[in-house]
Regions:
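N-terminal Rossmann-like dinucleotide-binding module
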Residues: 1-57
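C-terminal helix-rich "cap/oligomerization" subdomain common to oxidoreductases
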Residues: 1-9, 76-78, 281-305, 310-325, ...
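Beta-loop-alpha module in the N-terminal Rossmann-like domain of NAD(P)-dependent dehydrogenases
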Residues: 27, 59-119
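Short, Asp-centered acidic motifs that coordinate Mg2+ and/or phosphate
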Residues: 41, 76, 156
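Aromatic/hydrophobic pocket-lining residues that form π-stacking "cages" and hydrophobic walls in ligand
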Residues: 50, 89, 116, 142, ...
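Hydrophobic residues in well-ordered beta-strands that form the structural core
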Residues: 63, 102, 127-129, 158
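Predominantly a Rossmann-like dinucleotide-binding segment in NAD(P)-dependent oxidoreductases
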Residues: 126, 133-218, 222-237, 241-259, ...
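Contiguous C-terminal substrate-recognition/catalytic subdomains in enzyme active sites
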Residues: 241-315
Length: 406
């Protein structure tokens, strides 16, 4: 697959947003900066969010997903609601004849994923699952280097990241394993997407361990997994979200969102949480920092590097490749060189590239519904493996095509 650069188009795609929470807040700088899309409609139960949305974007506001999907100003529905609602909202969008961009995890069960894929197929619309960090330009560039054949085939992939994920502000559902809480479903999707893309083959099985060692956050906060692929490639995945060591140190002190890391913020998530008296205060504090809240956080920056998801190393037959926020390090037989990338003009622009290429040019998206379902299958298998202490075979996998540059 050649990386897509959509044809110019005279009219921006109208994006209807379901869920004006944190995921939307993170995507907002992209929607604002990219002229190929415009925010045309929104749906959220919080009055303060919809009021600001209407005022800021002169957009329509709806009270149901079905009404938003019927809005003629909407071409694409961005499903950024909590994961337990993804299937219902994506299906409503497809039935309304709208293309779907849905946040990860795609859903909470494979049956839900299949129903989303079926609805999109029946309606003749595209489903794209993202943003995930497999969209990041350094990851895609690494895929291009692999596809060139210069460094031989990939044989082993290592991915690891240490964050404060578990101690960021959370809703009660996010701390309930029965409702999909924990890092495996919510952060594992990033790493699984990345290693599947880099391996370029179908995953066949997974073995995982999960860590849960803080009673105040009673969900999995860490994991280690080994994923096997057809052709003998294997990948190790490690993630820890307890807010001590910061994995951004291994990425040039650039944060996950591509911003310069402020070392004074070490431990900030734990300090903020410790200042709150109970779960109700935590929910209120989270809402205040989301779109429309009194303390809304801006993620826009004029000094951006590429986004990342921690340390990733691909061991090929003749070199190790390491994607970084400013390019890809190539550790070859006789020298180490940087394959540089220019800084991004727009954060997460690759998501809009893929979306516009699908809608305008009919190019099959890389991160389609079947891709998202395969990633969820691996994540669910990681949970099963950790619980049952055994390898779990995978049955719904799809392989990524080789990604080449022009």
């Amino acid at each position: 697959m050649t990386l897509v650069h959509p044809s110019p188009h005279p009219r921006a795609l109208g994006v209807g947003v379901i869920g004006l929470g944190r995921a939307f807040t993170l995507m907002l700088p992209t929607f604002i900066a990219d002229p190929r899309v415009r925010l045309s409609a929104g749906f959220d139960p919080r009055d303060e969010a919809t009021a600001r949305f209407t005022a800021e974007f002169k957009a329509n506001v709806h009270t149901t997903a079905e009404a938003l999907a019927a809005d003629p100003a909407v071409d694409v529905v961005y499903v950024a609601s909590p994961a337990e609602h993804h299937a219902a909202h994506a299906i409503a969008a497809a039935k309304g004849g709208k293309h779907v961009l849905v946040e990860k995890p795609m859903a909470q069960s494979l049956a839900e994923c299949q129903s989303m894929v079926d609805a999109a197929d029946q309606a003749g619309v595209h489903v794209i699952v993202g943003h995930s960090h497999s969209f990041d330009r350094p990851i895609l560039r690494t895929c291009e280097l692999i596809a060139s054949g210069v460094y031989g085939a990939p044989k082993m992939i290592a991915a690891q990241y240490y964050t404060d994920f578990l101690f960021r502000l959370r809703r009660p559902a996010e701390l309930d394993p029965a409702q999909g809480g924990g890092v495996i479903l919510n952060q594992g999707a990033h790493q699984v997407d990345i290693v599947r893309l880099l391996a370029g083959a179908k995953a066949t099985s997974v073995r995982a361990l999960a860590g849960r060692w803080d009673a105040t956050r009673p969900v999995d906060g860490a994991y280690a997994a080994l994923v096997n692929f057809e052709g003998g490639v294997f990948a190790s995945l490690l993630y820890q979200g307890y807010g001590h060591f910061d994995g951004d140190e291994l990425c040039g002190d650039v944060t996950e969102l591509g911003q310069r890391r402020d070392r004074r913020q070490q431990g900030a998530a734990r300090r903020r949480l410790a200042s709150l008296a109970n779960a109700s205060e935590e929910v209120a504090a989270k809402a205040a920092r989301n779109y429309g809240g009194a303390e809304q956080v801006s993620y826009a920056s004029d000094d951006l590097a590429h986004q990342h998801f921690g340390l990733v190393v691909v061991s090929c037959e003749r070199a190790d490749l390491r994607p970084l926020p400013n390019g890809v390090m190539v550790y070859a037989d006789s020298e180490a060189t940087l394959d540089p990338l220019p800084p991004p003009r727009i954060p997460r622009v690759e998501v809009i590239d893929e979306l516009c290429a699908a809608v305008w040019d009919g190019k099959p998206p890389l991160h389609d519904g079947r891709w998202g379902m395969a990633t969820l299958e691996v994540c669910l298998a990681m949970l099963d493996s950790a619980r049952e202490n055994r390898d779990i075979a995978l049955h719904r996998q799809v392989a990524a095509p080789a990604i080449t540059s022009h």
